[in-house]
Structures are given as C-alpha cells and as structure tokens.
Regions:
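Short, charged N-terminal beta->alpha structural module
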Residues: 2-14, 127-135
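Core catalytic region of metal-dependent phosphoesterases/phosphodiesterases
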Residues: 2-5, 12, 18-112, 206
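Structural motif
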Residues: 8-9, 34-35, 115, 163-164, ...
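Short, flexible loop segments at the rims of nucleotide/cofactor-binding pockets, characterized by
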Residues: 12-17, 44-49, 140-145, 188-192
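Histidine-centered active-site/metal-ligand motif
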Residues: 16, 75, 168, 212
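Short hydrophobic/charged patches on amphipathic alpha-helices used for structural packing
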Residues: 27, 152-156, 201
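Cap/insert and terminal regions of metallo-dependent hydrolase folds
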Residues: 44, 48-65, 163-211
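Active-site-proximal loop/helix segment associated with metal-binding centers of metalloenzymes
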Residues: 92, 99, 113-195
C-alpha cells in the first residue's frame, strides 16, 4: 500500500527524458502527495540534460513530495533500468530508481489505497533503423514469453478483475481504429508489434475493468 494517502493521480504519455518538459509542464501543476504515472517512454538512460546529469535529476525528483510511477515503453535503456534493485511495492514487483521514482514492471498488479492497476509495458521502435543497439536501442523493448505468461498468471490470480489497465501501446483493434483517423498519422502496419497488440486484445476481452 502507499505510505500516505494520495490526493490525485495524473496520467501522462511519453516524457522521453526531457528535463525541460518535466519542470515546465509537470512540476508546475503537480502537488505534494499527488502521483504522476507515465505510460511508457519515461526515458531511463536519456535524462541527461543541459544543466543536470540523469542521476542528479533523479536526486531532484527524490526531494519532491509527489510520487513518480512509470511503465516502460520502447525508448528506455533497459540495461540501466534492470540494474536498479527489484522490490515489492503495493503487491507487485518494481524497480526503485529512487524512493518515490518507481518503475512498474510488466504483467504486475498493484493495489494502491482503494484502486488496483494492471500494467503491461513494452513496444516496438519504428525508428529502430536509426538507432544503435546497446546505445539507443535495446532488444528488451518487447515483452518476453515469460512476461506474457507472468501477466496472465497474475490476472488469473485476481479472477481477471482490476480497476485500471495501463499500457504503452494499444490493443490491435484500437490501433486499427486510430489508423483510420488520418489526422493522427497512425499506421497499422507494424507487424513486429502485433504479438503485443494482439495480446492486449485478449486482455481487454478477458478482464473486467472500469470505463474511463
């Protein structure tokens, strides 16, 4: 459980290690005891900024009164991310970057005060051809078979009932629908990600969750 009662949970998308965006757009609205949850591409390994190193920025976050939660996307340094200690937090496994900066691991279920959350990070980098393995791209960006199975086991354990589901990419049916909205510029041709998006379709059908 959380050590203190939260006031508000804010959910945002990719921050990509952008210190300026964090300070200007997030720091200005969040309050003590709030939670901010980043739905992947938090940017582990990419937080080196003009003024602060990555670890110094994490130290800055650790001095704040709010809690930073994030799932992984495809733009993370997974070697660095997996180097942090694994602990149990709110009933699920996490990597603790700092005491209040916490990576929610794939396939875990967390009970935070009065809500439960299932998370499934990961995604495929469509810009992989522009990146270098081990420097700006990591093969762990897509879930492993072990992680898929672990997710299903956890959902079965809670009878496929959870309040909220947090992912980085979307179920394949949603991706297809979004691709029909030409103004968004979303394509439905990333076959390398289909194992994950089809898996999320299955989760969406099986799990009872709250509408947003």
């Amino acid at each position: 459980m959380l050590s203190k009662e939260y006031k508000m949970i804010y959910i945002t998308g990719d921050t990509h290690g952008n210190q300026y965006k964090w300070v200007e757009q997030i720091e200005s609205v969040i309050s003590p005891a709030d939670i901010i949850l980043v739905c992947g591409d938090f940017g582990v390994g990419f937080w080196n900024g003009r003024y602060w190193s990555e670890e110094t920025f994490y130290d800055f976050l650790s001095e704040q009164k709010y809690t930073v939660l994030f799932i992984d996307g495809n733009h993370e340094n997974f070697d660095k991310l997996y180097s942090y200690p694994t602990e149990t937090w709110c009933g699920g496994r996490v990597h603790k970057i700092r005491q209040n900066v916490i990576h929610l691991m794939r396939g875990e279920v967390y009970c935070m005060e009065d809500i439960s959350i299932f998370v499934m990070g990961g995604g495929y980098s469509i810009d992989k051809h522009l990146r270098t393995e081990g420097i700006s791209w990591w093969s762990q960006e897509m879930p492993s078979e072990e992680e898929y199975n672990h997710a299903l086991e956890n959902l079965k354990r809670i009878n496929y009932k959870v309040d909220y589901i947090i992912t980085h990419t979307a179920p394949s049916e949603t991706v297809y629908y979004l691709s029909t909205l030409r103004s968004l510029g979303i394509k439905n041709d990333v076959v390398q990600e289909q194992q994950l998006t089809i898996f999320l379709d299955e989760i969406q059908r099986k799990v009872t969750y709250k509408p947003v």
